[in-house]
């Protein structure tokens, strides 16, 4: 049965730049950081009992009760920043790095439907937000030793919980941006818990990261989750990279 839920998706910056042998370690660190941030935000039990979670390799998509939304807006971003900063020296010693983009949204989702749990417009939209150029830019143009995460919040969530006064954050702590990804064209709000800036993004002198081509998408384009294709306007990973239905699903 459909119900309004809070949606969280995180994605690691330059995940594919790591060696293949290190990818599992980095993904485990993503899980550890998110779990720690939830626990320190008063969402520990909520996270342990989450009914729908997709492990995407370079990130996580989770659907949580709507009641978790205020804590996901604050203090979760600050707690995630702290968890990633604490892990950085240990990862750096192994030649690894981890910074996360994150998107928050709310909407109608059926997270229990056996044949296609979690598939909805809200799920697609939160991943469009994650792929927003302003979100990528604000993280890439920050100091990698200072800023470990950047968030984008949907306009719906912002209006209800930030402008509506249901969190301790003020509207002035967010930056309004326009997100244009495929047919998605809506306003959203950036929030960086520990902002910083650099004159030139790291590795900019080497040019943009070259990504290996992924498998061809289904005829006519679309999003594939758990082997179920949602019609779209091009090959798009609902989670962060091009996939073909091979995501690992966890349901409790």
Regions found by a protein language model. Name each.
Residues 2-5, 46-47, 92, 246, ...:
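Non-catalytic sensory/regulatory segments that transmit input signals in bacterial signaling proteins
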Residues 17-18, 161, 199-200:
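Short helix/loop capping segments that flank catalytic or ligand/cofactor-binding pockets
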Residues 1-71:
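Catalytic NTP-binding/metal-coordinating core of nucleotidyl cyclase/transferase enzymes
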Residues 165-220:
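Eukaryote-biased recognition of electropositive, low-complexity segments
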Residues 2-5, 57, 97-99, 146, ...:
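A general secondary-structure signal for short beta-strands and their flanking turns/coil
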Residues 69-77, 81-173:
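Catalytic beta-strand-to-alpha-helix segment of the class III nucleotidyl cyclase homology domain
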Residues 208-252:
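Long, low-complexity intrinsically disordered regions enriched in small/polar
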Residues 147, 184-186, 224:
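A generic structural signal for well-ordered coil/turn residues at beta-strand boundaries
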């Amino acid at each position: 049965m459909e119900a309004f839920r809070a949606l969280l998706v995180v994605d690691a910056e330059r995940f594919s730049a790591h060696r293949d042998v290190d990818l599992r370690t980095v993904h485990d660190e993503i899980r550890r950081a998110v779990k720690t941030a939830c626990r320190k935000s008063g969402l520990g039990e909520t996270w342990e009992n989450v009914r729908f979670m997709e492990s995407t390799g370079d990130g996580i998509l989770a659907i949580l009760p709507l009641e978790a939304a205020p804590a996901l807006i604050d203090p979760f971003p600050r707690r995630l920043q702290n968890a990633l900063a604490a892990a950085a020296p240990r990862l750096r010693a192994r030649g690894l790095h981890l910074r996360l983009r994150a998107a928050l949204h709310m909407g109608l989702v059926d997270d229990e439907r056996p044949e296609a749990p979690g598939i909805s417009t809200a799920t697609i939209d939160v991943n469009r937000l994650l792929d927003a150029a302003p979100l990528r830019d604000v993280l890439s143009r920050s100091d990698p030793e200072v800023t470990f995460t950047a968030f984008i919040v949907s306009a719906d969530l912002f209006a209800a919980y930030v402008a509506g006064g249901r969190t301790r954050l003020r509207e002035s702590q967010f930056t309004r941006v326009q997100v244009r990804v495929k047919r998605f064209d809506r306003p959203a709000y950036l929030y960086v818990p520990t902002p910083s800036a650099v004159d030139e993004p790291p590795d900019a002198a080497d040019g943009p990261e070259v990504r290996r081509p992924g498998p061809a998408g289904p005829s006519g384009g679309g999003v594939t989750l758990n082997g179920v294709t949602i019609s779209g306007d091009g090959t798009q990973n609902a989670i962060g990279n091009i996939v073909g239905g091979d995501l690992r699903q966890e349901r409790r």
